[in-house]
Design a protein with these regions (language model features):
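Alpha-helical structural context detector biased toward long hydrophobic helices
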Residues: 3-32, 36-343
């Protein structure tokens, strides 16, 4: 089956190794899997004087925004925040102290360079321009976030995106199903319960992530084709970067990793980039619904995506923060525990 050929864990036959070096997954001991990358969360940390591994953000439970606010605003350590044990595990290496095959190494390719990319955005002149490679790098990680966040797999935006990818992916193979079925079931059932998955649904979700990132299934990968297709037509898409350089006026990020405003013709998807920046991806509905048809092609050359950079537009920030609160699942996070810094 297609999936079997693509699903190379490590010891592969020589002809396959030559053809598909990128299809390899490397065993590693990482078991705490973040669905919003630590590097993204650290851009919202408040205790910058400690080393990056020990930084914290404030967690605002949604009950804080009720008519009668309840619950505590807690400082949480990023290393353990928005992460789940073995969320992206495909299989454990037998008898090898905690080594496992998971999607972490593939994810980390998209996470490296995030901090530098954020720094580069601070240097852009305000006004209209073309998006630089750093902004595309950030956007790609945010799109990956839509697809890998277990809280959002039932959101309509994510279901539409997954649907576009699914038309190109093979059916989940029996081999893949058996791998997931062989994982310790009490741990798996904890994930199913926490994120409202069925076992077949969770298995398909992992298979989709594997299939879209693997360069053994498609080369360039289906994910690379998706991000290229998104930005391929400058008439159908634009980016708006909002920056707040003056300090103490912050942007939330939601546990869902995005917020959405939609009307009949346009989707506006908002992403926190840092405590003092957020990004809006505006895309026409017609282009969004046509994405699936663009994925069979090899991506076009580097996109010429229109970008507008705007500074200190606080009304936009308030709207963004309110949407984050309204569309989060359990909590929003930020650099401060003072409401006036956000609203």
């Amino acid at each position: 089956t297609t999936m079997r050929k693509a699903f190379i864990l490590s010891e592969c036959e020589p002809p396959e190794c030559d053809e598909k070096p990128y299809a390899l997954l490397v065993a590693n001991p990482t078991k705490g899997h973040h669905f919003i990358a630590q590097t993204e969360q650290r851009q919202n940390a408040f205790n910058l004087q400690v080393n990056p591994q020990n930084r914290n953000v404030y967690q605002w439970p949604l009950s804080r925004f009720d008519h009668h606010p309840r619950g505590e605003i807690n400082s949480v350590n990023i290393e353990k925040n928005l992460e789940v044990n073995n969320l992206y595990t495909l299989t454990f290496v037998e008898g090898d102290g905690g080594q496992q095959y998971n999607l972490e190494t593939w994810f980390s390719r998209h996470e490296t360079g995030y901090e530098e990319a954020c720094e580069s955005l601070k240097l852009l002149a305000p006004g209209k321009q073309l998006a630089n490679p750093e902004l595309h790098r950030i956007l790609n990680l945010k799109i990956l976030g839509l697809l890998r966040n277990p809280l959002t797999h039932r959101d309509y935006l994510v279901r539409e995106l997954t649907g576009a990818l699914n038309r190109h992916l093979p059916q989940t193979g029996t081999e893949f199903r058996e791998l997931i079925a062989r994982r310790p079931q009490e741990r798996v059932s904890r994930i199913l319960k926490e994120f409202d998955f069925t076992l077949p649904g969770y298995t398909d979700w992992l298979a989709d992530l594997y299939g879209m990132l693997s360069e053994g299934v498609f080369r360039p990968s289906l994910f690379a084709r998706l991000t290229a297709a998104l930005t391929t037509d400058p008439n159908q898409i634009r980016l708006i970067l909002h920056r707040y350089p003056r300090g103490h006026r912050y942007c939330f990020f939601a546990d869902s990793g995005y917020c959405l405003q939609a009307d009949n013709t346009m989707l506006s998807i908002g992403f926190n980039i840092a405590a003092d920046m957020f990004l809006i991806l505006q895309i026409t509905r017609s282009h969004w619904h046509n994405l699936s048809n663009l994925l069979s092609e090899t991506p076009p050359p580097a996109p010429q995506t229109p970008l507008t950079v705007m500074d200190n537009q606080h009304q936009q920030r308030l709207t963004f923060n309110r949407l984050c609160i309204r569309q989060a699942h359990h909590a929003v996070y930020g650099k401060s525990n003072q409401l006036s810094d956000f609203l």
